């Protein structure tokens, strides 16, 4: 089983994930854990690109404007990891584009989502200039999962709820990258 941690959806994230997926495939991994815990989101086009690596077709998410008009955002064909068994890890800090990806994979029955309910961002903010030079930012479009579930204020509810005990601190890859094995062992619970 391979684990792929994605800390944000920045420019080039899809290309980086494709490269990682090729390495995972070459290593003959039997399953993949996509870790989106703590991921605040980012560029929605990168979310579409990444979700599309795992989906054979269909919709990644739906835009719904203030008039209620819904516009589906479709999968980009040619994904390279459409058959590997998949689990997506989420937490309360999984937001925005991360919710699009986890919701799309969950709705398609493509992945089991594990963790706690995500943040519940789910909107596009429009900025409007005011006469005094300031600006007003308000939600102009909301995101729905492919099955029409509202992300805003609801988040993505995991298939399997696993809450972190209050006395356990998360250990993220960057936090342990430079530690020796002895230092990592000293962090383990008694």
Placement of each model-derived feature along the sequence:
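C-terminal "post-core" interaction segments
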Residues: 1-190
């Amino acid at each position: 089983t391979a684990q792929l941690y994605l800390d944000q959806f920045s420019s080039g994230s899809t290309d980086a994930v494709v490269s990682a997926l090729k390495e995972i495939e070459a290593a003959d991994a039997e399953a993949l854990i996509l870790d989106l815990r703590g991921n605040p989101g980012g560029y929605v086009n990168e979310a579409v690109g990444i979700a599309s690596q795992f989906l054979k077709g269909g919709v990644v998410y739906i835009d719904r404007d203030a008039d209620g008009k819904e516009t589906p955002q479709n999968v980009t064909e040619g994904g390279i990891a459409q058959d590997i068994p998949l689990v997506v890890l989420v937490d309360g800090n999984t937001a925005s584009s991360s919710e699009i990806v986890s919701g799309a994979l969950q709705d398609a029955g493509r992945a089991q989502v594990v963790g706690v309910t995500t943040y519940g961002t789910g909107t596009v903010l429009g900025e409007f200039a005011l006469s005094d030079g300031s600006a007003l930012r308000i939600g102009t479009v909301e995101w729905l999962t492919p099955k029409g579930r509202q992300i805003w204020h609801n988040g993505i509810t995991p298939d399997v709820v696993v809450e972190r005990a209050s006395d356990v601190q998360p250990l993220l890859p960057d936090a342990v990258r430079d530690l020796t094995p002895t230092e990592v062992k000293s962090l383990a619970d008694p």
